[in-house]
Amino acid sequence: MFLDTKYRSNESEIMDDFALEGEILKEALDKIAKINQLLGGNHLTLKGVQELIHNCPVTNEITIVDVGCGNGDMLRTLADYGIKNNLSFRCIGIDANNFTINHAQNLSKNYSNISYRCVDVFSKAFEELKYDIVLCTLTLHHFKEDEIIRLITVFNANSKIGIVINDLQRSAVAYRLFQVLCFVFRLNTMSRKDGLVSILRGFKKNELVHFSKKLNVAQYKIQWKWAFRYQWIIKKVGDLESVRRKMEVKN
């Protein structure tokens, strides 16, 4: 059957309900994290962070915020990477679902440098949060265009070093392959439905370029990556050098 992916879908996902809770949600969060690991999603976001901090002094603390953090798997990956490479990361997970935040906290008890906040990204509390780097992994597609512009405007204003976005390519091939993954990983009904809707709410490269131009972003890079992802890195031009100097002064 022909699948039209010309335009983004407006269909909502079950997980868009921030009051959702229970074992079904917990299972979905953990399966999403596992699939993201196996398909290289965590590695893709980590590579983006590595690119952004390449010229930063490694002796200083870097605050990284993960928007739509899910079960916190990405932040634990970052924390492990930081420990292995003698980097000081302070990681903050953001999610609007309190059950999700509690689950992430339980899974991150052994990480003293990871904290979580149940916050609406369109609230004043989030708009006042400052950080060096902000991550948005498999989260941006949940928003409409005007919300995306508003959200990235906040990201750009409040981040000192840059932004790493990792999200889905909208394509019929990705849709069909995910149907196969549903069978292989025995995903529950919610995960199957939401996963397929997520792909239809994903992006074409020209749409991300359009957002970049509309936001008047000076330095950005958009690359297609396996498995049917786009890595969108926004660097704060001029700010990297000032951050480096401030860090050196602190030392």
Question: What residue spans do the PLM features occupy?
Answer:
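Conserved beta-strand signature within the Rossmann-like core of class I S-adenosyl-L-methionine
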Residues: 160-168
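Conserved Class I S-adenosyl-L-methionine
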Residues: 205-235, 247, 251
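A short, conserved alpha-helix within the catalytic core of class I
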Residues: 143-154
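N-terminal, positively charged/glycine-rich alpha-helical extensions of SAM-dependent methyltransferases
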Residues: 1-30
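A conserved beta-strand element that flanks and buttresses the S-adenosyl-L-methionine
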Residues: 135
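Class I SAM-dependent methyltransferase Rossmann-like catalytic core
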Residues: 22-48, 52-53
